[in-house]
Curated annotation (Swiss-Prot):
The modification Phosphotyrosine is found at Y529. It comes from Mus musculus. The keyword Glycoprotein does not apply. InterPro entries: AGC-kinase_C, Kinase-like_dom_sf, Pkinase_C, Prot_kinase_dom, Protein_kinase_ATP_BS, Ribosomal_S6_kinase_II, RPS6KA3_C, RSK_N. GO terms for biological process: intracellular signal transduction; negative regulation of apoptotic process; positive regulation of transcription by RNA polymerase II; response to lipopolysaccharide; toll-like receptor signaling pathway. This is Ribosomal protein S6 kinase alpha-3. Residues 1-26 are annotated as: Disordered. CDD domains: STKc_RSK2_C, STKc_RSK_N. Upon extracellular signal or mitogen stimulation, phosphorylated at Thr-577 in the C-terminal kinase domain (CTKD) by MAPK1/ERK2 and MAPK3/ERK1. The activated CTKD then autophosphorylates Ser-386, allowing binding of PDPK1, which in turn phosphorylates Ser-227 in the N-terminal kinase domain (NTDK) leading to the full activation of the protein and subsequent phosphorylation of the substrates by the NTKD.
């Protein structure tokens, strides 16, 4: 199974002469063809000032730059910057916004018209799935747009990380997008630049359409526009051939986006702009057979080269799309009211955190003095966002840029070596196929852990993929870097300075049931999150549950070592989640997944048993043979009475027995564990000292013997990453934008 797509979406582009750019560039700048929104009499040498009136947030006073504190840079290009700002005065003081700043001196007349148009469109638009403009104002030299700050980054980043989405994910995003486009169309606006980079995610995971620099309000009497603009791969045929286009062009781009999200590739993409345009006009599109009949049908109806025949172009407009069988399960009223839960919720932290924004920008000191970099092109103004590992430490900002770039480059076998950036220290742990060491990042002197995996013994793809997807969870170890030198893979993570959870608990002089409940709640909540995403850990032994610091607080617990973890996949390689699997996953795969999830709960039951009593349920010490241990486990018999159990409550014993049930089908799920009275009513649990066996070394040996017996027959054989269908099919070429 392949590593997630990690190529850098923002490749630096060399400055080209106008003639070269027109011939070779993939990006299409607005070129007047036929009727155009710009007065043909206007020349660059006689630029006229565009009057941008102030816009004030309803119920608030007029704004100016002095009312906003600059916190971070979110994006930067040749014409200006986007800042994360905090309002420091007025009735909305302390509110966070994104502030788009443009220098008038660097804007040509066409760019000024676009900026004015973007401002006017945003003032007019009020929709739950379209970014909101709160203020617009200008100074003598600059233009300012104050917009929603959307913490979740853009859809392009998530697509790059996931490779492709499930059909249920795509259905959700497309449905919200359809409502947003329909609202724009109802106002006479053609969006014209639909692509993942321009679809942002708010903190709940709902979409927000943004960047209206290429949108078109002024159209002729036939309701057609003639500008040749946007990103070529997403252009409709009528835009490419310059015969005039209507709002129907947005529905073609809607189809391109759908195809890309479902397959991980673009439907029409040649080696250069000219070939791509030819494919859009003439190429026959092969429909991937792993797509459902409903998805294939919708794509065929969107990819009609005659715009009049395209779904959504008829008199009913978006209703044609909403009635299509692909969206049959969507409740459109609930969707509009934001009552349907998104498939992905961005990690939450402090309000000003910028986990999903490019550290190339966020690491810069924010100054409201945008310059013109020598190699900047017009379309680079609002470059998007790339995956950044979640972290709550301010000091980690210096580390993030290095981490992201090394992850980006590791698939390309570049010349960068792990030891170029890190100094290797002592061993932390040694396994059968890997060794874990402490390491120090040379540039920042920060400590990390590195897991060095021998690729000849184990394919680390699944482990890295899971950490990339779910490492933003506060109780899952955070991935910082990945290097691949061909023989070994170096997985750099945060350092677990607090040590193993069980070690700390067993050495703790005072430990109560209430404390044990808090620990189990944190771990089980994390496991429930993984299981809901179709991920099973399969090796939840206590040595893989550690503290990130010395505090001992449940919040500092991290689940580590996903070397045996698995993600639920359909037969075609698509990642799935349990609620969407009925039509895509073989029953035996689901059965195995359910068994593995039950094994995770069993492991947590062993941990709970040991926390409460100070000894393990199935092994007496490190000298027990595997046969003896497996026989006890298979019998399902363990003691819950007498001795150390006399100080344990009946509700705790009930939970232990249900988590360690010998029949995996009768074992509690993670969700049911969280609903058990011992977890729910934690504040009513005893706070007195548990009477436990005081022999931590003996317990640790017994625990190691237990999991050694369980894992001794596990020897999975995995083929190299490159042989997987998904890896061969993946090859997304990153698209940049000409939009302001």
């Amino acid at each position: 199974m392949p590593l997630a797509q990690l190529a850098d979406p923002w490749q630096k582009m060399a400055v080209e002469s106008p003639s070269d750019s027109a011939e070779n560039g993939q990006q299409i700048m607005d070129e007047p063809m036929g009727e155009e929104e710009i007065n043909p009499q206007t020349e660059e040498g006689s630029i006229k000032e565009i009057a941008i009136t102030h816009h004030v947030k309803e119920g608030h006073e007029k704004a100016d730059p002095s009312q906003f504190e600059l916190l971070k840079v979110l994006g930067q290009g040749s014409f200006g910057k986007v800042f994360l700002v905090k309002k420091i005065s007025g009735s909305d003081a302390r509110q966070l916004y994104a502030m788009k700043v443009l220098k008038k001196a660097t804007l040509k007349v066409r760019d000024r018209v676009r900026t004015k148009m973007e401002r006017d469109i945003l003032v007019e638009v009020n929709h739950p799935f379209i970014v909101k403009l709160h203020y617009a104002f200008q100074t003598e030299g600059k233009l300012y747009l104050i917009l929603d700050f959307l913490r979740g980054g853009d859809l392009f980043t998530r697509l790059s990380k996931e490779v492709m989405f499930t059909e249920e994910d795509v259905k959700f995003y497309l449905a919200e997008l359809a409502l947003a486009l329909d609202h724009l169309h109802s106002l006479g606006i053609i969006y014209r630049d639909l692509k993942p980079e321009n679809i942002l995610l708010d903190e709940e995971g709902h979409i927000k359409l943004t960047d209206f620099g290429l949108s078109k309000e002024s159209i002729d009497h036939e309701k057609k526009a003639y500008s040749f603009c946007g990103t070529v791969e997403y252009m409709a045929p009528e835009v490419v051939n310059r015969r005039g286009h209507t709002q129907s062009a947005d529905w073609w781009s809607f189809g391109v986006l759908m195809f890309e999200m479902l397959t991980g590739t673009l439907p029409f993409q040649g080696k250069d702009r000219k070939e791509t345009m030819t494919m859009i006009l003439k190429a026959k599109l092969g429909m991937p057979q792993f797509l459902s009949p409903e998805a294939q049908s919708l794509l065929r109806m969107l990819f009609k080269r005659n715009p009049a025949n395209r779904l959504g172009a008829g008199p009913d407009g978006v209703e044609e799309i909403k009635r299509h069988s692909f969206f049959s399960t969507i409740d459109w009223n609930k969707l509009y009211r934001r009552e349907i839960h998104p498939p992905f919720k961005p990690a939450t932290g402090r309000p000003e955190d910028t986990f999903y924004f490019d550290p190339e920008f966020t690491a810069k000191t924010p100054k409201d003095s945008p310059g013109i970099p020598p190699s900047a092109n017009a379309h680079q103004l609002f470059r998007g966002f790339s995956f950044v590992a979640i972290t709550s430490d301010d000091e980690s900002q210096a580390m993030q840029t290095v981490g992201v770039h090394s992850i980006v480059q590791q698939l390309h076998r570049n010349s960068i070596q792990f030891t170029d950036g890190y100094e290797v220290k002592e061993d932390i742990g040694v396994g059968s196929y890997s060794v874990c060491k402490r390491c120090i990042h040379k540039a920042t002197n920060m400590e990390f852990a590195v897991k060095i995996i021998d690729k000849s013994k184990r394919d680390p793809t699944e482990e890295i993929e899971i950490l990339l997807r779910y490492g933003q969870h506060p109780n899952i170890i955070t991935l910082k870097d990945v290097y691949d030198d061909g023989k070994y893979v170096y997985v750099v993570t945060e350092l677990m300075k607090g040590g193993e959870l069980l070690d700390k608990i067993l050495r703790q002089k005072f430990f109560s049931e209430r404390e044990a409940s808090a620990v189990l709640f944190t771990i089980t909540k994390t496991v429930e999150y993984l299981h809901a995403q179709g991920v099973v850990h399969r090796d939840l032994k206590p040595s893989n549950i550690l503290y990130v610091d010395e505090s001992g607080n449940p919040e500092s617990i991290r689940i580590c070592d996903f070397g045996f973890a698995k993600q639920l996949r359909a037969e075609n390689g698509l990642l799935m989640t349990p609620c969407y699997t009925a039509n895509f996953v073989a029953p035996e795969v689901l059965k195995r997944q359910g068994y593995d999830a039950a094994c995770d709960i069993w492991s947590l039951g062993v941990l709970l048993y040991t926390m409460l009593t100070g000894y393990t349920p199935f092994a007496n010490g490190p000298d027990d043979t595997p046969e003896e241990i497996l026989a006890r486990i298979g019998s399902g018999k363990f003691s819950l009475s007498g001795g150390y159990w006399n100080s344990v409550s009946d509700t705790a014993k009930d939970l232990v027995s249900k988590m360690l049930h010998v029949d995996p089908h009768q074992r509690l799920t993670a969700a049911l564990v969280l609903r058990h009275p011992w977890i729910v009513h934690w504040d009513q649990l005893p706070q007195y000292q548990l009477n436990r066996q005081d022999a931590p070394h003996l317990v640790k040996g017994a625990m190691a013997a237990t999991y050694s017996a369980l894992n001794r027959n596990q020897s999975p054989v995995l083929e190299p990453v490159g042989r997987s269908t998904l890896a061969q099919r993946r090859g997304i070429k990153k698209i940049t934008s000409t939009a302001l």
